[in-house]
Amino acid sequence: MKPACTLLSLTLLSSPFVVSAQENIEKTFTFGIVSNKAQSKIKKSTPFTQYVTNGLAGYGYTKGAVKVFKNYRQLAVALENGTVQIATATPFNAMTLEAESGSQAIAIRWKKGLQKYHTVFFTHKESGIESISDLRGKTLVFEKRTSTSSYYLPAITLLNQGEKLEYLPSSDDKPAKDSIGYLFLDEHLAQSNEINLSVWVYKQRVAAGAFSNFNWSNPKDLPDSMKGKLTIFARSVEIPRDLILASPTLSQDQQHKITSILLGMETSQQGALALKQFQNTKKITALTPEMSASLNTVRTSIHLLPKVD
């Protein structure tokens, strides 16, 4: 005898009400994140996901779920095949997801209260460096190769200005005279952070450093006792702090509805609380022409980034 569930399926398939039954199948709305801290991310983003899900009952979504992926390649597959409906990512990762999955950035997430930011290039006041071209033949320190403000963004800023970049495995190595040498702080220190990056520039172990304008303004990342000896000599374009992307499997109507829910979250007490629990998100806003233009810069430049083994 066949199992009851199989018999039930056969009954539904032969029923004249099969279409309406399929339309009313309960669906799960899934939010995708990349992290190595799965349990923490699930806990913090579940209220956010459930809030969005509650507004999508008309599309058959009755449950919300958070799925954490180990890398963006896995998330791209999930967005492309529709097992994940929306996801969050920083601009460079978001543009990679767009290219690999066909997903689309639909809104800006004010992660940790910030709408946008940019990279500052800074040096010791006694270095003689006044512009990007002065970095040729010298060494620039980035924090780590996964950092937006302390690698991706400053690197494409240099490349778009026609500069050559040369990876240096050791801090004792020197770049060619016509190249800008760069290294990653996390490959040289057990504790890689913004304050240690500031110290390297302050002590002139390297010619310059790069991190976000918010790091520059934060005494925890750059103490006032050091800041007086340092100076900013260049800045990148401003980019969104974080983005929400939608799966290409969603209809335009569904995308518009989801976007509408996201943009209105801060206006309700429950929505605002859900945002705050999710990495202290202040609000979610629409992409402005300025931010769309900066994303296009990222989109057209990301292939320029050097491949470092």
Roles of regions detected by a PLM:
Residues 9-15:
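Bacterial N-terminal signal peptides
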Residues 24-95:
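Extracytoplasmic small-molecule ligand-binding "clamshell" domains
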Residues 24-50, 239, 245-246, 250-309:
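An extracytoplasmic/periplasmic, membrane-proximal ligand-sensing/linker region
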Residues 29-42, 134-151:
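Short loop->beta-strand "edge-of-pocket" segments that line small-molecule binding or catalytic clefts
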Residues 79-80, 135, 201-202:
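Hydrophobic residues within well-ordered alpha-helices
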Residues 107-131, 244-247:
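Hydrophobic/proline-rich hinge and linker segments of small-molecule sensing/allosteric domains
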Residues 123-140, 161, 165-169:
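Flexible hinge/capping segments at coil-to-helix
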Residues 141, 145-251:
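Pocket-lining segment of extracytoplasmic ligand-binding domains
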